[in-house]
Regions:
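Hydrophobic/aromatic-rich transmembrane helices and adjacent perimembrane loops
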Residues: 169-170, 290-292, 296-332
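Hydrophobic, aromatic-rich transmembrane alpha-helices
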Residues: 82, 249-277, 282-283, 287, ...
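Specific aromatic-rich, kink-prone transmembrane helix
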Residues: 124-142, 149-152, 156-157, 311-314
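Extracytoplasmic
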Residues: 47, 165-167, 214, 339-514
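Membrane-interface alpha helices of multi-pass inner-membrane proteins
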Residues: 148-165, 170-178, 198, 202, ...
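Perimembrane helix-loop-helix junctions
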Residues: 170-201, 268-275, 313, 319-329
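Transmembrane-helix motifs of polytopic, lipid-linked glycan transferases
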Residues: 71-95, 99, 106, 131
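Short helix- or helix-capping micro-motifs
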Residues: 7, 100-109, 157, 161, ...
Length: 514
C-alpha cells in the first residue's frame, strides 16, 4: 500500500506535464476517435491501434486536456505495479514481490514518468505484459483451471502486441518454454500452448473483425505493412554502424540504470544457484522483451522501459530472497553496511531525474506561470519541438477560427490540432507518410498515391489555416517540413494559389485561406 501511495503522489506532482510529439499524435487521434473517426479509414498511421484507443479512453474519462493523459498514465502504472507484484509473488514469494514492485514503482515513475517518456506505447504494453506473466505463472503452478490461466496469458500478450508488435516476442518465448521445457507432462504442455495461442488469437480476431466491419482493414494492411515496414526498415541500414549504435545505446542505458541491472543479474544468479525452476519463465520472458528492443532497433530512452519489468522482478528477488540468505550469518553492522550501499546505489541512479520535481511542484502550487513552466520543455535545433511555441500557435488558431473550422499542420505535430481543438481536413494529420524520403520503388509508388489523395482532400475541404513548420529536423526527418513543402510541388502550388502568409510564430508559418 505504501508504494502505491508513493507512486501516486510522485505522479500527481507531474500531472501538468505537457505532451511530447508522440503523445500529441496519440491525443489528437484519441480525440478524433471520440468524434466518430476510425483509425486507418479516417486517420492515417502506421502503428497498431492500441495506443490510440487508450488515449481515447483517457480523454473520455478525464477530459480533453494533457492532464487526462497523465492521470490515466498514473492509473495504468498502478495497474501494472499490481500485476508485477502478483507475478513476482507467484514466482519468488511475497517478500521478493514487495521489493520488486517497489523498485518498479520508483524507476517507472521517477525515470519514465517524465516529459516525452510517459504515456508511450511501451507504458501500456508493460501493463499487459505484467499480467501476461502473472497468468502464465498461475498456469504453471495450478492444475485447476490451468488452460484458462494460459488463455488469459495469451489474451494479455496480444493486448501488449496491440501497442508494440515486437513485444509479442515475450509471450512467444513463454510459449516455447512451456512446449520445450519439462515442468509439465507432455499432454499438459500441448494443451497449455494451445490455450496460450487461443488466448492470443481471440483479441487478434476481434480486431480484424472490427476493422473489417468499419471498412478499415485493407487500409490498416497498407499503412502498417507497406509504409510501416519501410519506415522501420531505415533503422537496419548502415552495416557495422548499426551494430555500433546498438552496443553503445545498450551500454549507456546499462550504466545509467546500474542499480537495476546489477540487482537483476545478482538476483538471477542467486535463483539459478538455488536451483529455483521459476527463474526460467521470468528469464525467457525478460529475454523476449530485450529482443523486442533489438528487433525494432530503436534506442530512445522510453524503448528501454520494458526492461524495467524483468529487471525489477529479479532485483526484487535479490533484495528479498538472495541477499538475506547470503548475509544471514553476518554481523548486524555488516548487514547494515550492505543495505546502506544498496540504497545509495539506488538513490544515485534516481537522483538525476528527481531534480525535475522542484519545478513541477512550483507550478502545481501556482508559484510560476504556465509560460515559465512550459519554457523548459523542448529546444529548437535539437530534433525537438518547442512546447511554448506550440501553445502560442494553438492559442492563435483558436482565437482566429471557429470550432468547426479545419486546420492543417504540415509537420509532425498534430498535437497542435488537439491543443487548439481544431480538426485536420482529412486523414493526413502529419506529413511523414507524404515526405518520407527512404524506401523502395514500391513505397515511392504508394507514396505517389498518398500525395494524390492528400491533394484531393485539400481541394474538397480546404482548411482555414495551413501551418508549415521549419527547423523540425530529427533522426526520422533529416530535412525540415518547410523544405519538404517546397519540394512537394503540387502542394506548394496549391498553397500559393489559395493561401497567403498571415503571420509567423517562431518556426511556424501560418497561411490563411484567401
Amino acid at each position: 500500500m505504501l508504494i502505491l501511495v508513493l507512486v501516486a503522489g510522485l505522479s500527481l506532482i507531474s500531472i501538468h506535464l505537457p505532451l511530447g510529439r508522440d503523445e500529441g499524435v496519440a491525443a489528437y487521434f484519441g480525440w478524433q476517435i471520440l468524434q466518430g473517426k476510425v483509425v486507418y479509414k479516417d486517420l492515417y498511421h502506421f502503428n497498431l491501434p492500441g495506443i490510440f484507443w487508450t488515449y481515447a479512453l483517457a480523454l473520455k474519462l478525464f477530459g480533453l486536456k494533457p492532464e487526462a493523459v497523465n492521470l490515466f498514465d498514473l492509473c495504468f502504472r498502478l495497474f501494472t505495479l499490481i500485476g508485477i507484484y502478483l507475478a513476482a509473488a507467484r514466482l519468488f514469494g511475497r517478500r521478493s514481490a514487495l521489493w520488486g514492485s517497489a523498485i518498479y514503482g520508483l524507476f517507472s515513475t521517477v525515470v519514465y514518468n517524465s516529459y516525452w517518456q510517459n504515456a508511450q506505447k511501451e507504458t501500456f504494453a508493460l501493463g499487459a505484459s505484467a499480467w501476461c506473466l502473472y497468468f502464465f505463472a498461475l498456469g504453471l503452478g495450478k492444475e485447476r483451471l490451468r488452460n484458462f490461466w494460459f488463455m488469459l496469458a495469451g489474451i494479455c500478450g496480444c493486448g501488449a502486441m496491440l501497442y508494440k508488435p515486437t513485444v509479442a516476442l515475450a509471450p512467444g518465448l513463454l510459449g516455447l518454454y512451456l512446449l520445450l521445457g519439462n515442468r509439465l507432462k507432455i499432454k499438459a504442455r500441448l494443451l497449455g500452448v494451445t490455450g496460450l495461442a487461443a488466448g492470443f488469437l481471440i483479441p487478434a480476431a476481434a480486431l480484424i473483425g472490427y476493422l473489417q466491419s468499419q471498412g478499415a482493414l485493407s487500409e490498416m494492411v497498407r499503412q502498417v505493412f507497406i509504409f510501416g515496414t519501410a519506415y522501420g526498415g531505415q533503422y537496419y541500414s548502415g552495416g557495422l554502424k548499426v551494430l555500433g549504435l546498438m552496443l553503445w545505446k545498450i551500454s549507456d542505458w546499462t550504466m545509467a540504470q546500474g542499480f537495476l541491472v546489477a540487482g537483476a543479474v545478482l538476483g538471477l544468479w542467486g535463483l539459478v544457484k538455488e536451483k529455483d525452476p521459476n527463474w526460467k519463465p521470468a528469464f525467457w520472458f525478460g529475454l523476449g522483451l530485450f529482443l523486442n528492443i533489438l528487433v525494432q532497433n530503436k534506442y530512445f530512452t522510453y524503448h528501454f522501459m520494458v526492461l524495467v519489468l524483468p529487471g525489477s522482478i529479479f532485483a526484487g528477488a535479490f533484495l528479498g530472497r538472495v541477499m538475506p540468505r547470503l548475509f544471514s550469518g553476518s554481523a548486524r553492522l555488516m548487514r547494515a553496511a550492505v543495505w546502506i550501499t544498496v540504497l545509495f546505489l539506488m538513490g544515485a541512479n534516481l537522483k538525476p531525474d528527481f531534480g525535475r520535481y522542484g519545478r513541477e511542484l512550483l507550478y502545481d502550487l501556482g508559484k510560476i506561470s504556465k509560460d515559465d513552466f512550459l519554457e523548459k520543455y523542448g529546444k529548437w535545433g535539437f530534433g525537438d519541438i518547442s512546447v511554448t511555441a506550440q501553445y502560442k500557435v494553438a492559442r492563435y488558431l483558436k482565437e482566429q477560427t471557429a470550432p468547426e473550422d479545419k486546420v492543417l499542420v504540415f509537420g509532425l505535430e498534430p498535437g497542435i490540432n488537439f491543443m487548439a481543438s481544431r480538426s485536420a481536413p482529412g486523414k493526413f494529420t502529419y506529413d511523414l507518410p507524404l515526405t518520407y524520403q527512404f524506401g523502395s520503388e514500391k513505397l515511392k509508388t504508394y507514396q505517389a498515391r498518398l500525395k494524390k489523395e492528400f491533394l484531393r482532400e485539400l481541394g474538397a475541404a480546404p482548411p482555414v489555416y495551413i501551418v508549415v513548420v521549419e527547423k523540425d529536423t530529427s533522426t526520422i526527418e533529416p530535412r525540415d517540413s518547410y523544405e519538404q513543402m517546397l519540394e512537394f510541388v503540387e502542394f506548394k502550388n496549391f498553397l500559393a494559389q489559395n493561401y497567403y502568409l498571415e503571420t509567423k510564430i517562431e518556426h511556424y508559418y501560418l497561411y490563411r485561406r484567401k
